[in-house]
């Protein structure tokens, strides 16, 4: 109760990789110089939200190139996500999911964001939405992750209300 969510899909968008130009840090705007693409839109949304869950398919035992380009630019251009809880989820056909989870979780850990756990690895198995719907254990893990994220957000709010 009291937790709002928004889903933002980037899978069909062309996401440019970070060039390492450093202009986002030099201009002190907390935005990438590539303009109002999905990265800058989400950065703006992240300023207003309290937590983040990132999902990716697994490609060659790693997160997709699109999501890593997205996260590279998002996290490099702003340091304003500290203490906002984060979680990663991955979807794969067979193997490589734990390596992809570790890759995504590093974005949170390197930016002082508490990791939100579940009852098991935050992954589902299947190539299609229909196959994923048959992964009952994976779906249970996702529900637990959602409850844990809500608990973490409420705990942080309670702490703030008491001066912590």
Task: Report residues per predicted region.
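N-terminal beta1-alpha1 ligand-phosphate binding loop
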Residues: 1-3
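Conserved beta-strand scaffold positions in the cores of enzyme catalytic domains, especially
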Residues: 5-7, 115
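N-terminal beta-loop-helix "entrance" segment that forms/cooperates
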Residues: 7-31, 128-132
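Positions that flank functional sites
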Residues: 12-13, 61, 123
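Residue-level recognition of specific faces of alpha-helices
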Residues: 17-20, 45, 73, 141
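Helix-loop-strand module that forms the ligand-binding subsite of alpha/beta enzymes
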Residues: 29, 33-120
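Glycine-rich phosphate/pyrophosphate-binding loop and the adjoining helix
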Residues: 35, 41, 114-164
């Amino acid at each position: 109760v009291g937790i709002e969510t928004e889903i933002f899909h980037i899978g069909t968008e062309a996401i440019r990789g970070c060039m390492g130009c450093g202009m986002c840090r030099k201009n002190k705007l907390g935005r990438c110089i590539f303009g109002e693409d999905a990265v800058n839109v989400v950065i703006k949304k992240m300023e207003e939200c309290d937590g983040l869950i990132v999902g990716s398919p697994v490609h060659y035992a790693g997160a997709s190139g699109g999501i890593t380009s997205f996260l590279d630019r998002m996290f490099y251009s702003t340091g304003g996500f500290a203490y906002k809880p984060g979680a990663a989820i991955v979807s794969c056909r067979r193997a490589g999911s734990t390596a992809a989870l570790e890759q995504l979780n590093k974005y949170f850990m390197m930016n002082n964001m508490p990791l939100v756990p579940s009852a098991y690895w935050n992954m589902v198995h299947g190539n299609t939405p229909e196959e994923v719907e048959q992964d009952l254990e994976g779906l249970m893990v996702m529900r637990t992750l959602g409850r844990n994220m809500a608990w973490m957000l409420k705990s942080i709010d309670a702490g703030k209300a008491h001066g912590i």
